[in-house]
Amino acid sequence: MVQFENSVTVSGLLHFIKSDKKDGKFFPFSIRHENLWVDGTTRKDFLTVRAFVPEVKEQLRTLAEGTPIKVHGVLRASRGSGDMYLSAERLEVLNQ
């Protein structure tokens, strides 16, 4: 049988999303990425992340907007909308 893998590691700048879900089942946030685009311009991407793990949720509450972070997790799709997001299992603060 084939073994499938679903693991994602992304780093960037922490960006908080305005949401009333921060005290609920998950803590939503995003990772800001600035990448050189094919036409030479800078593309700003905001990668959607949800933290379900209690330790990660608590860690996020102590961090400031723009903190360099690395997130380890798995890619998921929302049951309702089908939107893709990274489900954060572990978070590291990167040295500036």
Protein language model features and the residues they cover:
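Single-stranded nucleic acid-binding surfaces, predominantly the OB-fold ssDNA-binding core
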Residues: 1-96
